[in-house]
Amino acid sequence: MELRRGGVGSQAAGRRMDGDCRDGGCGSKDAGSEDYENLPTSASVSTHMTAGAMAGILEHSIMYPVDSVKTRMQSLNPDPKARYTSIYGALKRIMHTEGFWRPLRGLNVMMMGAGPAHAMYFACYENMKRTLNDVFSHQGNSHLANGIAGSMATLLHDAVMNPAEVVKQRLQMYNSQHQSALSCIRTVWRTEGLGAFYRSYTTQLTMNIPFQSIHFITYEFLQEQVNPRRDYNPQSHIISGGLAGALAAAATTPLDVCKTLLNTQENMALSLANVSGRLSGMANAFRTVYQLNGLAGYFKGIQARVIYQMPSTAISWSVYEFFKYFLTKRQLENRTLY
């Protein structure tokens, strides 16, 4: 990651927080910021991957119970016992009726996917951003370059993450037939084949690319309002990122609902829609959602999705930025010593 002034303007939505500084100061002149400014102008690929992996694991681990509720609230034909009106009420009922640890079922497979997925995302994004910015803009920051870099990084991220999403969402559903991630993987592989793990991949990409575009535009606008000097300012990055992530999450909820349907293959819902076999394809998912619930169906779970996305983005950026700073500083100190 380049450490230059104007930093965060180049980040892709919801995935990173840039603390770049160059040519002098960035905000307050405490010891921490001075140390930050004295770091080398780029971090290694291993630093980006390690920091990204930590950010992904912590983000998904902390917010996983809310994600479990979101998945259930997006169900098109939920069991009467699994109809919820609020996140708090849902978590309380799930823990009371299904066990204290039930909201965490599937967390292990999510962590296994989030680590490598986020590691590849950050490493790919940082290196492509730097390369493409040199091509498109000699001034150092091109929105086109950042957008292309983010889109390419998303292809890698979702290729790793999609199978984990399929497994964890099936484990999260009410009355799931799967008791563990391993049994779910075996059952899906045996009954539906390898393609089932990527049935929602195109929908995932279709959702994430506009998500990042909306987040990027909103984030840049908010940064101009709260941090016009574009200094390294963790508070402004977290606030702007959280609000931008919330807007992007709300706008892309219809795509997320379709993705959930493709991942979970709700038998009751598909039966009501007269769908035989397995549902595949984003267009078919859109038609099925509308057939069952009308326009309102596209916004099922929007509250949970927004509440999930805001702190997730803040956690991801703050953790990534901390580990990037910490690891780069350690590498610099080791080179100085030896």
From Swiss-Prot:
Coiled coil: none annotated. One of its GO terms (cellular component) is mitochondrial inner membrane. Residues 1-37 are annotated as: Disordered. The keyword Repeat applies. It comes from the Eukaryota. The chain crosses the membrane at residues 45-64, 106-125, 143-162, 200-219, 234-253, 301-320. It is found in: Mitochondrion inner membrane. Its main location: mitochondrion. It is a multi-pass membrane protein. Solcar repeats lie at residues 43-131, 141-225, 232-326. One of its GO terms (biological process) is iron import into the mitochondrion. GO terms for molecular function: ferrous iron transmembrane transporter activity; iron ion transmembrane transporter activity. SUPFAM superfamilies: Mitochondrial carrier. Gene3D superfamilies: Mitochondrial carrier domain. It catalyses: Fe(2+)(in) = Fe(2+)(out). Signal peptide: none annotated. It holds the Pfam family Mito_carr. Keywords: Ion transport, Iron, Iron transport, Membrane, Mitochondrion, Mitochondrion inner membrane, Repeat, Transmembrane, Transmembrane helix, Transport. Belongs to the mitochondrial carrier (TC 2.A.29) family. PANTHER family: MITOFERRIN-1, MITOFERRIN-1-RELATED. Mitochondrial iron transporter that specifically mediates iron uptake in developing erythroid cells, thereby playing an essential role in heme biosynthesis. Interacts with ACB10; this interaction stabilizes SLC25A37 and enhances the function of SLC25A37 to import mitochondrial iron during erythroid differentiation. This is Mitoferrin-1. It comes from Rattus norvegicus (Rat).
